[in-house]
């Protein structure tokens, strides 16, 4: 008689548990769909640094006074008030009205600045997804990717990309996805910091980028940042679903009941 009651209780608990799991699986994934609403890259401040260089009011892959492969007050790769990697009131990789990259604040203070508090949730996410990059304000470096095959609209640009793609990044810098309200903000920030960091690192070695290089690099990095967002969103959703599953009352009750049976 006792065994039949125990079996009935176990059956009821399992039904309640799987009902709760079914509800968890119906929860929508964070972030929303791609290409939904508004411009692709809202005009918001980027925590990683300056926005993309001024390009005459065009969006990604849009003309700046001309289509792809057409002059913009000059031919491809020619300077517009100065070549890429050279100062424009503080150019790529050079100070903009202050200290260099990774520097800031006042120096010579009597007291040391207080250390920022560590968010353990972000640390756990970093351990699962990638290493936190020192000196870049909590950005993580993603795993290496194959550079995407992109067509730029002209034979010259396609050939130029195939011949120079090795000079462009194959990894991106990013912050945890839970720090962004949507995928557009994530990709915008990811492209900003990745292009800037790669340009700074390369120009310090004596190699400059042309305007053609920068535009192609932005397109390449954009695709990799989208891929990185999809990976991180999926991992974040799975971690959240696991936490919800094991913290649900039916599961806790079932575990407690099984422990009671084993101990008793």
From Swiss-Prot:
Sequence repeat start-end pairs: 54-62, 63-70, 71-78, 79-86, 87-94, 95-103
Sites of GPI-anchor amidated alanine lipidation: 241
Keywords: Amyloid, Cell membrane, Copper, Disulfide bond, Glycoprotein, Golgi apparatus, GPI-anchor, Lipoprotein, Membrane, Metal-binding, Prion, Repeat, Signal, Zinc
Residues annotated for Cu(2+) 2 binding in this entry: 80-82
Biased composition, class Gly residues, residue ranges: 55-107
Region (Interaction with GRB2, ERI3 and SYN1): 25-241
Propeptide, chain numbering: 242-264
Disulfide cross-links: 190-225
Any GO molecular function: copper ion binding
Main location as per UniProt: membrane
Positions contributing to Cu(2+) 1 binding: 72-74
One annotated Gene Ontology cellular component of this protein: plasma membrane
Classification via Gene3D superfamilies: Prion/Doppel protein, beta-ribbon domain
Clinical note on disease: Variations in PRNP are responsible of transmissible bovine spongiform encephalopathies (BSE), a class of neurodegenerative diseases that affect various mammals. These diseases are caused by abnormally folded prion proteins. BSE can be subdivided into at least three groups: classical, H-type and L-type, with the latter 2 collectively referred to as atypical BSE. Susceptibility or resistance to a BSE disease can be influenced by at least 3 factors related to the host prion protein: protein expression levels, number of octapeptide repeats, and specific polymorphisms.
Role: Its primary physiological function is unclear. Has cytoprotective activity against internal or environmental stresses. May play a role in neuronal development and synaptic plasticity. May be required for neuronal myelin sheath maintenance. May play a role in iron uptake and iron homeostasis. Soluble oligomers are toxic to cultured neuroblastoma cells and induce apoptosis (in vitro). Association with GPC1 (via its heparan sulfate chains) targets PRNP to lipid rafts. Also provides Cu(2+) or Zn(2+) for the ascorbate-mediated GPC1 deaminase degradation of its heparan sulfate side chains.
Domain characteristics, as noted in the entry: The normal, monomeric form has a mainly alpha-helical structure. The disease-associated, protease-resistant form forms amyloid fibrils containing a cross-beta spine, formed by a steric zipper of superposed beta-strands. Disease mutations may favor intermolecular contacts via short beta strands, and may thereby trigger oligomerization. Contains an N-terminal region composed of octamer repeats. At low copper concentrations, the sidechains of His residues from three or four repeats contribute to the binding of a single copper ion. Alternatively, a copper ion can be bound by interaction with the sidechain and backbone amide nitrogen of a single His residue. The observed copper binding stoichiometry suggests that two repeat regions cooperate to stabilize the binding of a single copper ion. At higher copper concentrations, each octamer can bind one copper ion by interactions with the His sidechain and Gly backbone atoms.
Family to which the UniProt record says this protein belongs: Belongs to the prion family.
Assembly and interaction partners: Monomer and homodimer. Has a tendency to aggregate into amyloid fibrils containing a cross-beta spine, formed by a steric zipper of superposed beta-strands. Soluble oligomers may represent an intermediate stage on the path to fibril formation. Copper binding may promote oligomerization. Interacts with GRB2, APP, ERI3/PRNPIP and SYN1. Mislocalized cytosolically exposed PrP interacts with MGRN1; this interaction alters MGRN1 subcellular location and causes lysosomal enlargement. Interacts with KIAA1191.
Protein name, per record: Major prion protein 1
Species per Swiss-Prot/TrEMBL record: Tragelaphus strepsiceros (Greater kudu)
């Amino acid at each position: 008689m006792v065994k039949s009651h125990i079996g009935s209780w176990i059956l009821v608990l399992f039904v309640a548990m799987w009902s709760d799991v079914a509800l968890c699986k119906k929860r929508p994934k964070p972030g929303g769909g791609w290409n939904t609403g508004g411009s692709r890259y809202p005009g918001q401040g980027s925590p990683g640094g300056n926005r993309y260089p001024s390009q005459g009011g065009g969006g990604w892959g849009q003309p700046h006074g001309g289509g792809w492969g057409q002059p913009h007050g000059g031919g491809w790769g020619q300077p517009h008030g100065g070549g890429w990697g050279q100062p424009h009131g503080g150019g790529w990789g050079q100070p903009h009205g202050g200290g260099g990259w990774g520097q800031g604040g006042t120096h010579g203070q009597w007291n040391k600045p207080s250390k920022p508090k560590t968010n353990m949730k972000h640390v756990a996410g970093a351990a699962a997804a990638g290493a936190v990059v020192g000196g870049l304000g909590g950005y993580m470096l993603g795993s290496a990717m194959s550079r995407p095959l992109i067509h730029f609209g002209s034979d010259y640009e396609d050939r130029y990309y195939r011949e120079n793609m090795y000079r462009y990044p194959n990894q991106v810098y990013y912050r945890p996805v839970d720090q962004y309200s949507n995928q557009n903000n994530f990709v915008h920030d990811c492209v900003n910091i990745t292009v800037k960091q790669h340009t700074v690192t390369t120009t310090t070695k004596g190699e400059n980028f042309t305007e053609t290089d920068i535009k192609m690099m932005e397109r390449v990095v954009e695709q990799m940042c989208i891929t990185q967002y999809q990976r991180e969103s999926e991992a974040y959703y799975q971690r959240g679903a696991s936490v919800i599953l094991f913290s649900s009352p039916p599961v806790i009750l079932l575990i407690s009941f099984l422990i009671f049976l084993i101990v008793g």
